[in-house]
Amino acid sequence: MSKLSRHAAIRDAITSHPVQNQDELRRLLFKRGHRVTQATLSRDIHELGLVKTGEGYQFPSSEDDSNAAWLPSVERLIREFVYDVKIAQNTVVVKTSAGSAQPVAAALDAEGWPEVVGTVGGDDTIFVVTPSNKDAEKLQSRIKELIA
C-alpha cells in the first residue's frame, strides 16, 4: 500500500471515529488493509499535521469544513513523487513513482498555476497541457527546481 493510500485511510479513520491513541489508529488501519509500525504511524501523524485533543486525534482546522487542512502542497507532492519531467511542444510529461500520478495531477490542477491548462494522470505518468511552448519550458523549469 502506498503512502498516499495510507494517508487517505488515516484521514478517513480520524474523520469517521474518535481515535484516542496510536494503537487504536493502528488497529483501524489494519482493518482497512494497512499494516503499519508505530514508527511509520508516528511519521504519518506528523506529516498529516494531526493534533491530539481531549477528543482524540484531529486535523488542526477541524472546525473548517474544507479538506484543505490535510492536503499536502503541490510542491511537497512534486518533491516526494516526481523524478523526471520532459517537454513535447506545449505538453509537459511528468514521470512519478508508481501510483502517484493521479494525486500529483490533481494537485497541479487545483494549484491554479498559469502554466497549467489541464492534466491527465495515469499510474506513473502525467500529461500537462500548457498554453504555449514557452509556458511548457517555464513549467518544466519550475518542476525541475523542486526535484533538484
Curated annotation (Swiss-Prot):
Pfam families: Arg_repressor (PF01316), Arg_repressor_C (PF02863). Keywords: Amino-acid biosynthesis, Arginine biosynthesis, Cytoplasm, DNA-binding, Repressor, Transcription, Transcription regulation. It comes from Koribacter versatilis (strain Ellin345). Signal peptide: none annotated. Belongs to the ArgR family. The gene is argR. This is Arginine repressor. Regulates arginine biosynthesis genes. GO terms for molecular function: arginine binding; DNA binding; DNA-binding transcription factor activity.
